[in-house]
Amino acid sequence: KTLLPSSKLISTDKLETQKPLEKSGIAVAKTKTVNNFEQIENAFEELGGGPLWIRAKSGAGGNLSLLCNNSSEAEYWIKLWILRKKANFNDFMIQQYLPKRNIAWDSFWYEGKLISSFTRERLEYPLKHISPSGITGTPTVSKIIVDEAVNSIGEKAVKSIDKKPHGNYAVDLKENDNGDWYVTEIDSGKFHTTTPLWGYVSTKFLKQDPTHNLPYLYTKLGLGEILDPEPLGSDIYPEGLHILRHIDCGTWIYREDGFKEQVI
């Protein structure tokens, strides 16, 4: 037994994801595609000038991404990957830069019903000094936040791509200078990388009911040991709880009141 959305909803193309979001009135980052180097300067002008993100249409971990201040930087960046035969011109897109908070909204659905969700802010990335973009995939420091606007946008975003959500849907959001939220990506049918880690913390250290551990709940449903999950609501983890981790440093939970404990 699986809990997966329809295969037609699982798209690796970020531009394709934007279409139903825009149709539903959900803000997305302004984006341009280019077919040749001559179009790059025009794209910068149309998007209001730099800095702008140059990034791949698909992939994770900041794939082929760089924050470029002007069209010349963007041209050199794209040309580098084409010369190395690691990408083609149509692999790239140019996207609005949203400078404020970087948010992940994880949600679990069962036959169209939202069972649970939680929101976390990504604060630091591992070894970001070796990546030109400063993005290296999964965060080393993140914290739980509670934001009703994010909950509302996350639910609306998922329902815009799937009328009867089933399984896990991971939504990425970025914030602009005015505090407005933009959906940048939806991963249908998968967990964000640290979701199992938050589930482990929930069960072992927060002593919550095991169903707050979303991978555990997913597994039990798949095995038929849970038949009809009870909704837990949004914000299933306590606000302000941090997870800190790094290579060879273990994993810790932390609060700003000074509490900390090693979990792995």
What is each stretch, according to the model?
Residues 1-35, 42:
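Conserved N-proximal alpha/beta basic substrate-recognition cap immediately N-terminal to
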Residues 32-36, 66-69:
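Short acidic-hydrophobic, aromatic-tinged amphipathic segments that line or gate anion-handling sites
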Residues 41-47:
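Short amphipathic alpha-helix with an adjacent loop that forms part of the alpha/beta core around
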Residues 69-71, 75-133, 137-158, 162, ...:
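Phosphate-binding site of ATP-dependent enzymes
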Residues 145-264:
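ATP-dependent carboxylate activation and anion-phosphoryl transfer catalytic cores
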